[in-house]
Amino acid sequence: MRLIIRAIVLLALVWIGLLMSGYGILVGSKVNAAGLGLQCHYLTARGTSTAQYLHTNSGIIGFSDCPIFRKIATVVDNG
């Protein structure tokens, strides 16, 4: 029971951190547009967000993988 309560408290703290910072965590990605586009899905405190990037395997011009964290435009607390 104590483990479940600690897990719930930890999830609540992570959610509050995401809400205040405006960052999202990567939850999924896929390559589209004949391999030239990279679509990344992020989980934020306010829902999900989608970002489109140019995809290259080398990562020189575009992205080879989605970034794990992404700053979302809307932030609750701007200081």
UniProtKB/Swiss-Prot annotation:
Domain of life of the source: Bacteria
Residues of the signal peptide: 1-33
Pfam family, one: YobH
Keyword entries, A-Z: Signal
Protein known as: Uncharacterized protein YobH
Source taxonomy: Bacteria, Pseudomonadati, Pseudomonadota, Gammaproteobacteria, Enterobacterales
